[in-house]
Swiss-Prot record:
Example of a GO biological process term: positive regulation of natural killer cell proliferation
Primary localisation category: secreted
Tissue: Secreted by activated dendritic and phagocytic cells and keratinocytes. Also expressed by dermal Langerhans cells (at protein level).
Protein family (similarity comment): Belongs to the IL-6 superfamily.
Subunit structure: Heterodimer with IL12B; disulfide-linked. The heterodimer is known as interleukin IL-23. Interacts with IL23R; this interaction enables recruitment of IL12RB1.
Alphabetical list of Pfam families matching this protein: IL23
UniProt subcellular location: Secreted
The organism of origin for this protein: Homo sapiens (Human)
Protein name (record): Interleukin-23 subunit alpha
Length: 189
């Protein structure tokens, strides 16, 4: 007869084969999330355009700056919040990942040879999608904030918009990576 531990592992086997890290109501595979979020940080920095000084006054395109998700103090991503209930924080991170994945798939980032699937931006897009799927509980769809419908950008706007989006993404994935590093170090079984 199989021991209870072996039975539990057998029950989890189909679940892990589907690539899910967060069963409904439980904690994620913190180490997997940590590794993927560290990769996202590296990709976000390598995807950043190599340009000189840019004047980034926030007076311009409100469409891509006002609705950008941020991880804030009240999101439960602090050590105590993660210990008590990590789901709110993970949902917030998931919302941000989906938001940036949509932006990277928009016309702001398409049509450029440097943005092909093997490019840093293409890899960044795929990694964002991978981590968001890793966080999505099976059979449970978190409410995602309304992704703003972007009007088509003009070619002359795209360089500045890319710069702003990638800069904001760098900050977001840096905080997410810290959350997952803490979770992997202190909350993993």
């Amino acid at each position: 007869m199989l021991g209870s531990r072996a039975v539990m592992l057998l029950l989890l086997l189909p679940w892990t084969a589907q690539g899910r890290a967060v069963p409904g109501g439980s904690s994620p595979a913190w180490t997997q999330c940590q590794q993927l979020s560290q990769k996202l940080c590296t990709l976000a920095w390598s995807a950043h355009p190599l340009v000189g000084h840019m004047d980034l006054r926030e007076e311009g395109d409100e469409e891509t700056t006002n609705d950008v998700p941020h991880i804030q103090c009240g999101d439960g991503c602090d050590p105590q919040g993660l210990r008590d209930n990590s789901q709110f924080c993970l949902q917030r991170i998931h919302q941000g990942l989906i938001f940036y994945e949509k932006l990277l798939g928009s016309d702001i980032f398409t049509g450029e040879p440097s943005l092909l699937p093997d490019s840093p931006v293409g890899q960044l897009h795929a990694s964002l999608l991978g981590l968001s799927q890793l966080l999505q509980p099976e059979g449970h769809h978190w409410e995602t904030q309304q992704i703003p419908s972007l009007s088509p950008s003009q070619p002359w706007q795209r360089l500045l918009l890319r710069f702003k989006i990638l800069r904001s993404l760098q900050a977001f994935v840096a905080v997410a990576a810290r959350v997952f590093a803490h979770g992997a170090a202190t909350l993993s079984p």
